[in-house]
From Swiss-Prot:
Name this protein carries in UniProt: Late secretory pathway protein AVL9 homolog
Keyword Nuclease: no
Regions crossing the membrane: 214-230
Protein source organism: Pongo abelii (Sumatran orangutan)
Chief place where the protein resides: other
Amino acid sequence: MEKARRGGDGVPRGPVLHIVVVGFHHKKGCQVEFSYPPLIPGDGHDSHTLPEEWKYLPFLALPDGAHNYQEDTVFFHLPPRNGNGATVFGISCYRQIEAKALKVRQADITRETVQKSVCVLSKLPLYGLLQAKLQLITHAYFEEKDFSQISILKELYEHMNSSLGGASLEGSQVYLGLSPRDLVLHFRHKVLILFKLILLEKKVLFYISPVNKLVGALMTVLSLFPGMIEHGLSDCSQYRPRKSMSEDGGLQESNPCADDFVSASTADVSHTNLGTVRKVIAGNHGEDAAMKTEEPLFQVEDSSKGQEPNDTNQYLKPPSRPSPDSSESDWETLDPSVLEDPNSKEREQLGSDQTNLFPKDSVPSESLPITVQPQANTGQVVLIPGLISGLEEDQYGMPLAIFTKGYLCLPYMALQQHHLLSDVTVRGFVAGATNILFRQQKHLGDAIVEVEEALIQIHDPELRKLLNPTTADLRFADYLVRHVTENRDDVFLDGTGWEGGDEWIRAQFAVYIHALLAATLQLDNEKILSDYGTTFVTAWKNTHDYRVWNSNKHPALAEINPNSVQNSERGKKIGNVMVTTSRNVVQTGKAVGQSVGGAFSSAKTAMSSWLSTFTTSTSQSLTEPPDGKP
């Protein structure tokens, strides 16, 4: 059967690459104990050897602090082997069992409890679906109380590849276990802040324990971006490691060469904090603020005032040299109009303290991109007008090329990967951590998201200003929260609600980003863009994802009204049309809800049925004990 699932070159044909068991050894720590097929061709299934690219696999599959929980689930990403291919998606279920309960206790088991993790390495980002199947298998594997019984794991590999062989990334099964409703109920208006943070390609760290809450929240935020889960993560774990950044930083010497990538920009090095120049402009402003409609959107540290003189040492900065496109500094050519906030008066009506949340300041500006693409046949390098994302895009250019060119998505980051936070080839990241050491390294990131408390800590006042919600933003967020809370009981009862449901929320964010993109293409669009935040849009236009999108044509956007929902009279009409439309297709929404809600049950039922059949056949074959076994 294995031969049927593999091509002549030995490469697996199905979406599942490997089934791996990771255990904790009292002397060696976390290590791979079993892999099928072997992680390295030619090795045995019990080999501990790891490919260099996957050296962190044991620490991801069996996370830090696992001993504090009886069982948990982890989502993680691995880079492709040999630099070829796409991200490998890992789903791991770990459990622990008392050593005295084991039927067969191996000699190296010296502790009172045994921790092991069963994980699937897949080519498809089917997080929830694989989790549902894997939880049952892990439970059955532990129920054997004999970890040498690996036949069930080999059969799991074959079963998953046969059942998922024709799996599509376009259906609702991609979003299983990712609930925007729960996210909105928990973060409320701050969901839009998280959305904008990632649009700006900032360094964002999510923090909470246990791991399943962490990865669930992080991946749910990403599911708000159209097409991101399905097609936007294929390059999210690739980077070219170089030396870590020192305090003095020699960034000019460490910039990636143009030929390091298919497409390269002169300004792709992290642009998270702009050092002393921005601080001089900023001056001193009040920091703590409250909003009438909501608790403070950002957690502001009291010590930030005293940190101003030391900012040059605390924050990572991009190269100070000017771009090759201009002999002047980007700051010298900055349009003074971007220093003004046209929405300040309007926001004062919502809350008198809100406009003082961030000091007025300018926005980073970067050089225009230079695209390098090898020419077919000749192999010569030529300049071409458009940047290539390398992603499978729809007619609107979705998903945006956020997680490309060294901007990483790490749903769970092991402590052993800490160096990535200061690697100069990592433009930014959206990462999750459970170890408090990550949270303490605030100078290495732009924002820390405390999931448990629904807090967003941003220590850079200029970034807080960029993310300061406009009146239109607050209306949009309130529109979401109101519909989710009003329909909470109905959706919970039958799981099929449309308005306020998971698919409905994703539809609202799709309209939001489509309208924002359409607005950037309009002439005389200052008033429209002010609804999203003039300074925010200016900063966003300098990100890699926007430059890639803007360098290509998307005719379908001509049909999009460039007004965000709830931001004006026309915007309100759009919102009303969406509500009417959603009511008209409520039956379709219920069908979608039923398919999503039932997919978990369906997956578990199918796996239980297969597991029952496998267990029965195994029991029959073991009616008589083998020779030599008591």
